[in-house]
């Protein structure tokens, strides 16, 4: 039998296992050299021999540095090499069948952090060139955001407060969990403008692997209305009750004019230990989010992903604000739509922050159940906010002045579009009632921001058309993933399919259509530090479940199994839960207790008449006495019910006929529901409780934990993360 010869090439993508084998072999050779062994051929002779082979066999120029590309499944490696990494390389690609690689040419290399390496870019194994090809700082990777570094000349620290001075148009990037305010001058942060006239502190949680916030100093003479001109009582500052000046500041008798007097803008920072940095205790992969020593740190040297505001966003928002300043203006109803991953949520957050300069409140209609801004996934909601939206969703403490949310029980409206449209109709009707009351009271009418889901093909286009008919927007913004500027270098991302926009958006004339660009194309590499949608949803859900409403902070040190539960009866005269509803396929009544125990459920407040006088549903009791609504697996009517929050049904006490559940519930809402004689219903949807929420990290033995199977020795088929493919084309499609 003839042995198969292995053909190697400097441009052939190698797997991570091959790279590791080459590195280990090089380390072994160095160890042998240190023990006194002599090499048969010197490095110079090997290099000359290798160059001769390359010239003889392929007539290609020799390569000084050997490039190895780490192959990651699902990532397109056909991208063009970065200009810096291709300066010393030939433009001609050697033939895969004619070129060889000498393993001795590989040198040792070490990766400092997985956050600084892109799996889609070729890595040079030479130590000196790794720092050149891999962007470690924004100055080398992203010239559009020239952030400054904190030095002794532009900063001043007094105990727990850090003061940083900025000149006009200078930018500062910070990461961590901290609070900030303007001591002198004005600055902008992702569309929101802060002024020294407001003495309150604002919280910000800026983890790594997300867009780093950028503080930009602006001209103090700008005659624009700022957020700080409103009364401080109207701002949403309940979650961080911090005095304007600490006793330590009074001790040093600091005056704003005496702090860094050579700078027009001075920003004060303080560390804010709110417990979020300890999220890695319950979610291991979140360790890289806060992988820095201090809770307040300069991001100029540790981040290469900054919050970028394209020029098209700025011009659109300026035009919108200018139109609202006219006497005959119409209060805008802005709908933001586009495909998945196009930056709809980012732009909605940006335009909301800009509009807060002109309005005291903004109505936000969040119709994306997969990536909501305030509530966990699986909900759509309407809320009124009066403070800027800063930071990632899971790291945001936001308490709207009013909120109405409805539970879909799924991250997509695809399985029940009729119920989704009914929920949208209910939420928009609530906004219309509010506007009507404002007009009667002759008060300010607030604008509406509508964030749509990313499902825009097929049935998604029909849903989007229905949303337009219901909400009647005055402005429609379509977010495009296509590069609108040819000056940007070509980039490959996880979104490779052709751009698609529904035809009805351009054919209808009752609104103004605007196409805006996404921000992913401005990043050094869209695939670097990418947090998937599933991980985002898990972060948001765990952040929600571990939030302590009484202390206004996160508590990841206590497991959900160790938290004191809320106990309420489901049977008897003093019952607190009137019924249980299960969305999905019809269920046998005997299996109710097993189906809902240890699951994620929504707490609903329903109108009494909707349950008593309904012809399509009835309430029966299970063998355990649990009241179950029989309505063919349909959700509750959104016109007569609303969601109070998410809970984890931890235990069903059959002896006392009680439900024990945990979750950040607002007990005042439950008390108000009882006062209005509303019935409390638990609804089980299709949302899955993460495995990390079931674990009790205090225990060492996982085999005895219920509902959890952790077998480290053998992994069964199907035990990995579930992945659904929706891009499979059947053969029947090609049959004429």
Curated annotation (Swiss-Prot):
Gene Ontology CC terms, in alphabetical order: chromosome, subtelomeric region; Las1 complex; mating-type region heterochromatin; nucleolus; nucleus; pericentric heterochromatin; perinucleolar compartment; rixosome complex
GO MF annotation terms: ATP binding; polynucleotide 5'-hydroxyl-kinase activity
Biased segments, Basic and acidic residues type: 47-58, 81-90
Keyword Phosphoprotein (UniProt): no
Key words of the record: ATP-binding, Chromosome, Kinase, Nucleotide-binding, Nucleus, rRNA processing, Transcription, Transcription regulation, Transferase
Enzyme class: transferase
EC number: 2.7.1.-
Protein's job: Polynucleotide 5'-kinase required for both rRNA processing and heterochromatic gene silencing.
Protein's name in the database: Polynucleotide 5'-hydroxyl-kinase grc3
Species of provenance: Schizosaccharomyces pombe (strain 972 / ATCC 24843) (Fission yeast)
Gene that encodes the chain: grc3
